[in-house]
Amino acid sequence: MSLIIVFFFFSLLLTSNGQFFDESKNYEGSSDLVDLQYHLGPVISSPVTSLYIIWYGRWNPTHQSIIRDFLYSVSAPAPAQYPSVSNWWKTVRLYRDQTGSNITDTLVLSGEFHDSTYSHGSHLTRFSVQSVIRTALTSKLPLNAVNGLYLVLTSDDVEMQEFCRAICGFHYFTFPSVVGATVPYAWVGNSERQCPEMCAYPFAQPKPFPGSGFVAREKMKPPNGEVGIDGMISVIAHELAEVSSNPMLNGWYGGEDATAPTEIADLCLGVYGSGGGGGYMGSVYKDRWRNVYNVKGVKGRKYLIQWVWDLNRNRCFGPNAMN
């Protein structure tokens, strides 16, 4: 349900062809350790899913373009060169509901609302996010209870309950008493000012604790040159995968507690390539400017997004996998 903060300390070797190789072998997960189950609830399976963005706070148009292009890349009419964001989404789509319907193939950006006046202040809670959605719905956006998905993105000066201490993002569903219907939504914040070392890792490094023996490594260069935004992209991908496979908290997850589930992206937290796991990010790419990425998007964009659990392979997987 939430992207929980975990530090990952990477140990990588750079090969002559510009690709990273982890010192470890295959640690992409083990089916023996995973208790992922289907709990008979829905997945987001509409043939076309309408995505609505709520930009909360003051946003740089360049930052918005990077995020929009990622969302366009999920189901672009002309997918980017392999490995692409749309290839990554194919792994998410493996999950079905009890009718046999897979997760949606087409995610369409259908509307945006800019809440630049901070209508509910600069300090939000998990519950007040629903009021933010209500404000957007009464101002501009439609209430789409049929095939709508709402994405609340907060600027780097907005504080969120548990942000930087326990979470980088979360998903849930709205209450009819607040919004007027039950619709799935996700929240992700820009951590650049508050905790980039936690929610934008590996583009920012945690400060070593005195006496810990930990030596900070060279920071990875973000593929779009924006530490906070490039960090947000992976969290957005994480939450999109999980809200799609577990929108009402009774779909796909592991564990006994539906209010604190281990979902399909949680199982692969910190894994971005082959060999990843146990604190290693895995094999990823570097471009000519030494920016790190593992998938390509529309308009020549590149992104670094974490893998998700592959239902068929019984391990974490992404399109940049070496095997």
UniProtKB/Swiss-Prot annotation:
Glycosylation sites recorded in the entry for this protein: N102
GO cellular component: apoplast
Signal peptide start and end residues: 1-18
Record bears the keyword Hydrolase: no
Disulfide bonds: none
Any Pfam family: Phi_1
Compartments it resides in: Secreted; Secreted, Extracellular space; Secreted, Extracellular space, Apoplast
InterPro entries: EXORDIUM-like
Entry superkingdom: Eukaryota
Keyword annotations: Apoplast, Glycoprotein, Secreted, Signal
Principal place of residence: secreted
Assigned protein family: Belongs to the EXORDIUM family.
Purpose of the protein: May play a role in a brassinosteroid-dependent regulation of growth and development.
Full protein name: Protein EXORDIUM-like 7
Species, as recorded: Arabidopsis thaliana (Mouse-ear cress)
Gene this chain is encoded by: EXL7
